[in-house]
From Swiss-Prot:
Keywords for this protein: Electron transport, Heme, Iron, Membrane, Metal-binding, Mitochondrion, Mitochondrion inner membrane, Respiratory chain, Transmembrane, Transmembrane helix, Transport, Ubiquinone
The protein's name in its UniProt record: Cytochrome b
Subunit structure: The cytochrome bc1 complex contains 3 respiratory subunits (MT-CYB, CYC1 and UQCRFS1), 2 core proteins (UQCRC1 and UQCRC2) and probably 6 low-molecular weight proteins.
Predominant location: mitochondrion
Location(s) in or outside the cell: Mitochondrion inner membrane
Miscellaneous information on this protein: Heme 1 (or BL or b562) is low-potential and absorbs at about 562 nm, and heme 2 (or BH or b566) is high-potential and absorbs at about 566 nm.
Length: 371
């Protein structure tokens, strides 16, 4: 390939020692491209009508040439998107990438937009779980004092979830990915303003190499791994991430035994239902994401990354275990012992963010004592 076409990448100096954990940004970009492409082809054949939506999905998978490929790539691609973004955030927490405040805050905004987009998309097939998940989650708006009921009616476009709701959810699901593209551009521009951090958390200005070919090949390897996994799941277990309830058409008269959102929202849903109060649960749900914004302002350690901070490492891996446990608990019915497990893990989840500054001070003291 001619050298001049790669000039843009060659002009981008990147830290020599960034590891595989730094590859997930480019993988997220690939996921976004895949979702917009497959989503466009699905939108060509989808009908946003409560009587026809479910049938149009069946039509896409059965009658449209390669429609099943597009539909499966889109639904499994969403799961891949969230796997990558959660790893991307975990890396940011571990290596304290959040100290680059603008990049971190734009990233959290991106996460919130992505979650909204995925939620709207989950409603579109108009299956049982789509309908009831939409009913339960949008109903949380009624917990807002004074404005709640008006806001919910405004969002629904009526007094219940019906045709206007599906139409506006489709419109929002179509437009929000372009907002994500814009925010991604902002995120990348802000990142290259200062440059990536690295596993040591040190200034790497004196030790940088061109992005291409060194890091671009490393990115390509992980990208190949992700695409292979995506196609393996699509070929051998296409319904791996789907809920069996969603294979039945939405019926407002029959409530599923256990209403739950897609797996990537289960941690937030688990926190929501662990609080036996509607407003309290809604606030906890919002805070489960919003609390990430506090990280740049509560960092007290003199050492940037957790590579050299064993106490923080312990808390970090506790957070990961907590995240997985909440996700698992949220798949279970609301009965003992799952209620208690959900409440304990929710407390543990928030305690990571609250004890982080205290741990930083403790580690600083320990380092001062040893020097």
């Amino acid at each position: 390939m001619p050298h001049h076409t790669l000039l843009l990448f060659n002009l981008l100096p990147v830290s020599l020692n960034i590891s595989t954990w730094w590859n997930f940004g480019s993988m997220l970009l690939a996921c976004l491209t895949l979702q917009i492409t497959t989503g466009f082809f699905l939108a060509l054949h989808y009908t946003a009508n409560v009587n026809l939506a479910f049938s149009s999905i069946i039509h896409i998978t059965r009658d449209v040439p390669y429609g099943w490929t597009m539909q499966n790539l889109h639904s499994i691609g969403a799961s891949m998107f969230f796997i990558c973004i959660y790893i991307h955030i975990a890396r940011g927490l571990y290596y304290s990438s959040y100290l680059n405040k603008e990049v971190w805050l734009s990233g959290i905004t991106l996460l919130a937009t992505l979650m909204a987009t995925a939620f709207f998309g989950y409603v579109l097939p108009w299956g049982q779980m789509s309908f009831w998940a939409a009913t339960v989650i949008t109903n949380l708006l009624t917990a807002i004092p004074y404005l709640g009921t008006s806001l919910t009616t405004w969002l629904w476009g009526g007094f219940s979830i019906n045709d206007p709701t599906l139409t506006r959810f489709f419109a929002l699901h179509f437009i929000l990915p372009f907002a994500i593209v814009s925010l991604t551009s902002v995120h990348i521009v802000l990142l290259h303003n200062e440059g990536s951090s690295n596993p040591l958390g040190t200034n790497s200005d004196i030790d940088k190499i061109p992005f291409h070919p060194y890091h671009s090949y490393k990115d390509t390897l992980m990208l190949t791994f992700m695409i292979t996994t995506l196609f393996m799941i699509m070929s051998f277990a296409p319904d791996l991430f789907n809920d069996p309830e969603n294979f039945s058409k939405a019926n407002p008269l029959i409530t599923p035994q256990h209403i739950k959102p897609e797996w990537y929202f289960l941690f937030a849903y688990g926190i929501l239902r662990s609080i036996p109060n509607k407003l309290g649960g809604t606030l906890a749900l919002v805070m489960s994401i919003a609390i990430l914004m506090t990280m740049p302002f509560t960092h007290t350690s003199l050492v940037r990354t957790m590579t050299f901070r064993p106490l923080s490492q312990l808390m970090f891996w506790t957070l990961i275990a907590t995240f997985i446990t909440i996700t698992w608990t949220a798949t279970k019915p609301v009965e003992p012992p799952f209620i208690t497990i959900g409440q304990l893990t929710s407390i543990l989840y928030f305690s990571f963010f609250m004890t982080n500054p205290l741990l930083g001070w403790t580690e600083n003291k320990m380092m001062m004592t040893n020097t």
